[in-house]
């Protein structure tokens, strides 16, 4: 005899509520020198409360997984600044503008019922575990892993024993990076002379890290730097461990795979020419402009 039944997949939480946010902004706008110079500034602080999380510890006798609960607070703080200058000299006109935006965020509270005191995030290889975490006192989803102290005489990594118990385990993991930049910035240059015009735009970021543990699979995603600077008997001062190393699971979750993500690049260059109206009117066109656009 077979019986069919249904049951809730998780417990009910009658106290669950919407997340809330409070934000304070202080701004300043300034124009000077007959509008040739402009400046805009904005400082902000945003507090988000009662974040909904689900990694909650409950007794086994409950029979189900725990319901989501309001268990976290986050603070984001920073400022945004934009300045520009424009002028002309005869038939030549130009403008220069730049902007910068900073961001500092921190998890200010996480309910003690959250399993392990943190929420584990993304994984690279399931067997290696997660490499990011949401934890009180740290930036949102910071990179968490092992720290390589040095390479031994065989080219294997020696990890830092942060808890001092003589063995390397998950308790030795520490903050090894963060994905969010300290600040982002952009720069725009424009110039025109008679019928020609040019604009250049670039942007960048500073202080963000990139975790590239997928390079752990050297067959498919090998980085040239790791290949060139790998340990060999002829290269004892190498930066990276030897291929087929021991403790590969820990090495794949270590700061060996954290790279500086700061960058600046030119994203767009545009060159244009506007035909004189006395030419275009002859073919019944009010305005005609051709341009060459490069996206990088």
What are these regions (language model features)?
Residues 205-290:
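Extracytoplasmic gating/loop element in the C-terminal half of outer-membrane beta-barrel translocons
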Residues 26, 37-39, 94-96, 187, ...:
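Transmembrane beta-strands of outer-membrane beta-barrel proteins
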Residues 18-62, 94, 101, 105:
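Membrane-embedded beta-barrel scaffold of Gram-negative outer-membrane proteins
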Residues 33-36, 88-94, 107-113, 277-290:
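Short loop/turn motifs that connect adjacent beta-strands in outer-membrane beta-barrel proteins
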Residues 4-38, 64-89, 178-184:
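Outer-membrane beta-barrel signature, preferentially recognizing the C-terminal barrel domain
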